[in-house]
Amino acid sequence: MWRCRASPGAQSAPLLGFIAVRDRYDQAQCLQAGRIWQRAHLLATARGLAARPSNEAVEMVDHERALARPPSRAALLDRLTGDPSCQPTFVFYMGYPKHAAPASPRRPVEAVLLR
């Protein structure tokens, strides 16, 4: 199962979440799911939480579809929502980090403002 291959840090995360859409192959819905993830990730970081994507399960849905196999992974994922019209399209882990991540380099705000 895909969860067994997750990194040790992810396995200890107390939250496994997902973002679901009505049609995981609709471009507008996928873009909106990405925006939701960006906002949730920024909010989590601001509150001292760590979050990381874990889309192996969703990628397996695409893999089965590309190979014209029965949608067994899609059926498993769809059961997570309890609503057959909601399809998980983005999976993530979230929790409090054991170690602080190094800060990513940032330019000063003045360097990126348009005037």
Language-model regions: role of each:
Residues 1-115:
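Acidic, surface-exposed loops and disordered segments
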